[in-house]
């Protein structure tokens, strides 16, 4: 008799066990009607929350948009409140400087979820423009200071140009009287930074700062909060030089206030593009910018203070016989001269502060920036 193959018997036993296991699995998986039951799945709640902007001027609005999955109800918390639809959009107001947090909380059968969006509110905005200087692109910065409670109106613009060695942010933080005027809603302040902390008036740098100024105007021109028909410029020392240069080479400024610097001889030779009003201030003991003209700081050849004002007046068709008066600015006596009767209701003023050097500090009884702003307003056509 042939020998029985034990391996064959073993295989048969294994197959029987496997078939029994499969049958048991199928039986346990069947529903009452004989069909296969669904295997339970965990559908977790999902929120997609987005915003139209990541930063916004305070009191202005942004749009929030959201969609959800696997949720039954939603509500808002943080800097917005109330029940929310499962998908939708909402305009929300930015009410404070810094982070404004908008949180959406949703509940579903398989749990809860919360998603937040932070929107930065600001009154100071730092912006960058690229400019070609010496064949290479350079970042040029400027700061915009808005009122604390901006309205929907368009605001006049006042540019403030720092002196040599300064920057826009420093100038913004230096004059509390300017901030007060801005927060009262009189105007929006723009504080540019000079390339290498200087303005190119007499070849101080390779930058074209008139072009930089025009680039700023172009950059902000689409925003209706800026009234580009009322643009003014204030400059201190080296900043006065660029204010005079912009005033001569463009027609954007409606008024300028060059402080402790008059026109250079080269700028004086330029025929102005437009007509504007001038509020010029000099100290009679200025050792950097000589009041009587000549070579001064950075080997710059200045006109005299009176000659600079007369140059403006002559170009603007003013009466060339100025009115004279004596004023008191704090502890300082001031000789004031006014050329009136200029084209388009403009006026040219210059002030010589006695016993004063290269400074605009004349004591606490006088606020120069309030005087300048009142002068600008008085010349509006």
Residue positions per predicted region:
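C-terminal motif of bacterial Sec signal peptides marking the signal peptidase cleavage site
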Residues: 28-29
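A domain-start/cap signature at the N-terminus of enzymes
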Residues: 35-40, 88, 118-157, 205, ...
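Proline-enriched interdomain boundary motifs that mark the N-terminal boundary
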Residues: 42-51
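Solvent-exposed segments in extracellular or luminal domains encompassing
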Residues: 84-101
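Serine-hydrolase catalytic machinery in alpha/beta-hydrolase-like enzymes
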Residues: 133-146, 152-232, 241-245, 362-366
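The conserved beta1-alpha1 loop
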Residues: 159-163, 260, 282-283, 354
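C-terminal catalytic histidine-bearing segment of alpha/beta-hydrolase fold enzymes
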Residues: 277-281, 303, 313-381
């Amino acid at each position: 008799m042939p020998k029985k193959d034990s391996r064959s018997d073993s295989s048969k036993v294994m197959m029987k066990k496997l078939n029994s296991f499969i049958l048991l699995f199928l039986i346990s998986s069947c529903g009452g009607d004989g069909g296969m039951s669904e295997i339970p799945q965990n559908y977790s709640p999902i929120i997609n929350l987005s915003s139209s902007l990541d930063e916004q001027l305070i009191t202005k609005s942004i749009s929030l948009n959201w969609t959800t999955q696997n949720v039954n109800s939603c509500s808002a918390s943080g800097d917005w409140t109330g029940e929310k639809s499962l998908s939708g959009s909402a305009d929300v107001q930015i009410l404070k400087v810094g982070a404004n947090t908008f949180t959406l909380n949703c509940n579903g059968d398989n749990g809860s979820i919360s998603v937040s969006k932070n929107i930065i509110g600001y009154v100071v905005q730092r912006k960058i423009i690229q400019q070609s200087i010496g064949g290479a692109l350079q970042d040029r910065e400027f700061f915009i200071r808005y009122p604390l409670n901006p309205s929907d109106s368009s605001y006049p613009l006042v540019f403030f140009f720092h002196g040599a060695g300064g920057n826009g942010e420093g100038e913004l933080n230096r004059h509390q009287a300017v901030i007060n005027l801005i927060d009262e809603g009189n105007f929006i302040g723009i504080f540019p930074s000079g390339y290498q902390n200087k303005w190119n008036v007499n070849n101080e740098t390779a930058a074209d700062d008139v072009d930089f100024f025009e680039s700023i105007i172009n950059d902000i021109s689409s925003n209706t909060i800026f009234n580009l028909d009322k643009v003014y410029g204030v400059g201190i020392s080296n900043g006065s030089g660029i204010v005079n240069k912009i005033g001569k080479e463009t027609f954007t400024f409606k008024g300028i206030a060059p402080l402790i610097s008059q026109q250079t001889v080269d700028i004086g030779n330029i025929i102005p593009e437009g007509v504007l009003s001038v509020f010029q201030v000099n100290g009679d003991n200025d050792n950097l910018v000589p009041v009587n003209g000549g070579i001064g700081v950075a080997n710059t050849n200045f006109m005299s203070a009176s000659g600079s004002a007369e140059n403006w007046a002559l170009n603007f068709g003013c009466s060339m016989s100025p009115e004279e008066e004596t004023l008191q600015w704090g502890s300082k006596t001031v000789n004031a001269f006014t050329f009136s009767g200029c084209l388009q209701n403009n006026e040219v003023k210059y002030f010589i502060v006695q016993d004063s050097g290269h400074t605009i500090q004349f004591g606490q009884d006088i606020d120069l920036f309030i005087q300048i702003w009142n002068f600008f307003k008085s010349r509006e056509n």
